[in-house]
Amino acid sequence: AGGGKADTVNGDGILVLDRNGKKVWQWSVFDVCDPFADAELEKHKKDWMHANSLSFDVDSNYLLSFYNLGQVWKIDAHSGRVLWKLGKGGTLRMPAADVFSQSHAVHIDPAGSLMLFDNGVGRKQSGVFAYRIDTAARSAAVDWHINLPAEIYNDRMGSAYTIDDSLVLCCCSKRHITVLVNKKGEIVWTLDTAIPPYRVEFIPAALLKPYILD
């Protein structure tokens, strides 16, 4: 792996606190992975796996996205065991053409699919994937997929969330742009910003109404 005795490997974890700030549960990548088994550890030691999103699956276990690995892990919220790994070199079978290339904003969408913003680093084109996970078959299949226009390719950061059955709100952070697209990837609305937004989420008007002054 390289390096010396004084080197530090920075990893990621999950910390659960109660409302009083007391630790309830803790998990670390070092509990389940040996950094010295990574042949490229010297290259990534300052940010070994780069976790960038944490959310709940429908069964209340954790979904954790690792940018540097190009994977999403499902982690048992009680034992800390890694239940499966989705993505490049993962434990769930899927066609090579359906594998995302680095991801952000992993979550379960309203239809129950695992949805993520695909940075598309390998293809130099970003997009959105929604997968159906078959835990019994240890496989993943694409529910739907959108390719965003090549001119707003976004290799870092970003997010994607459905607004309804036909529209998806996508944030291309490094391009300083948020777009509303249909399931064909066609842009129907655009918001340009002076700063790079890390993530953009849709808030229904009903939730905003109490805070809007007439």
What function would you assign to each model-found segment?
Residues 1-214:
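Histidine-/acidic-rich catalytic cores in large beta-rich domains
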